[in-house]
Amino acid sequence: MNPNYLDFEQPIADLEAKIQELRKASTGPAVNVETEVRALRDKLRVRTAQIFRDLSAWQVSQLARHPQRPYTLDYINTICDEFHELAGDRAYADDKAIVGGLGRIDGRPVVIIGHQKGRDTKTKVARNFGMPRPEGYRKALRLMKLAERFRLPLLTFIDTPGAYPGIGAEERGQSEAIARNLLEMAELKIPVICTVIGEGGSGGALAIGVGDRTLMLEYGTYSVISPEGCASILWKDAAKAKDAAEQLGLTAKRLKGLGLVDKVIREPTGGAHRNPEQMGKRLKAVLLNELDALEKIPVDTLLQQRYERLRSYGAYEGH
């Protein structure tokens, strides 16, 4: 897959293009460009490290939305020995923006739920651009209860710009579906690990984001609103999204510092899309370590710790 470069990655794109040109020029028997290629590769490594060492919040937001970034099903295919998808909320419909089912990771049975985006126009529309409707969240709740019934740990993968705000979704109880999931997840008598793999957009993310551990990929984002939405509200100008991104504090590093994220998982140089296989292996190792720790904790203690964890985020005081 050819990389889809973001604007701030242009120096990287230029260097990689030069390397490709030299490779093509070296097809003749008398041409040896290995020395030049090695020099350019060294320069590429240094330049890439420089760029990704000092990313702004807006640049991280761009990476979180990268069209080649691995999605939930990509990670499932990488980390699971086997996976059986389950469909439908048993009330209205099957929402393709949420996927979930039963899987095994190194032989360990788990239930996995996650947001799912599309890659091309057809699948983007089918997945509703990763924005779930109420039936998606009710499908997720059905799988959560299934996990609890069979005492299987629950893994959720968060990657959505937000819950779908359409009229039909509101008529079918979008806010109730999200609120119900928040309540039920807080009381699940099983280990729950939530991982932000891309965008974490407001209540649409939180509806599968309450658990015992919150993990976040290095270039993921987690916020109450998108930078563009925030800029439109505060400054009546979506072009100020860069400023909004900084003010929102939506990066993994910032959220870890605030205590809202338990662990930040490092991504391959250039982002998860540059080496999805390596990213999947890193994610798998972290998930297994966290599961090992959580499964040793008695259920009553687990629930108490989860309650205290949620309360530690803060409380609203009326005036």
Swiss-Prot record:
Against InterPro entries, the record matches this protein to:
Acetyl_CoA_COase_a_su, ClpP/crotonase-like_dom_sf, COA_CT_C
Q: What is its EC number?
A: 2.1.3.15
Please list the residue ranges annotated as the CoA carboxyltransferase C-terminal domain.
32-293
Q: In which pathway does it act?
A: Lipid metabolism; malonyl-CoA biosynthesis; malonyl-CoA from acetyl-CoA: step 1/1
Keywords on record: ATP-binding, Cytoplasm, Fatty acid biosynthesis, Fatty acid metabolism, Lipid biosynthesis, Lipid metabolism, Nucleotide-binding, Transferase
Which GO biological process entries does UniProt record here? fatty acid biosynthetic process; malonyl-CoA biosynthetic process
Predominant localisation class: cytoplasm
Q: Where in the cell is it found?
A: Cytoplasm
Q: Which GO terms describe its cellular component?
A: acetyl-CoA carboxylase complex
Reaction(s) the record says it catalyses: N(6)-carboxybiotinyl-L-lysyl-[protein] + acetyl-CoA = N(6)-biotinyl-L-lysyl-[protein] + malonyl-CoA
- Which Pfam families does the entry mention? ACCA
Gene Ontology MF, one: carboxyl- or carbamoyltransferase activity
NCBIfam families, alphabetically? accA, AccA_sub, PRK05724.1
Q: How does it assemble?
A: Acetyl-CoA carboxylase is a heterohexamer composed of biotin carboxyl carrier protein (AccB), biotin carboxylase (AccC) and two subunits each of ACCase subunit alpha (AccA) and ACCase subunit beta (AccD).
In UniProt terms, what function does this protein have?
Component of the acetyl coenzyme A carboxylase (ACC) complex. First, biotin carboxylase catalyzes the carboxylation of biotin on its carrier protein (BCCP) and then the CO(2) group is transferred by the carboxyltransferase to acetyl-CoA to form malonyl-CoA.
Family according to the record:
Belongs to the AccA family.
Q: What protein name is recorded for this chain?
A: Acetyl-coenzyme A carboxylase carboxyl transferase subunit alpha
The species this protein was found in: Xanthomonas axonopodis pv. citri (strain 306)
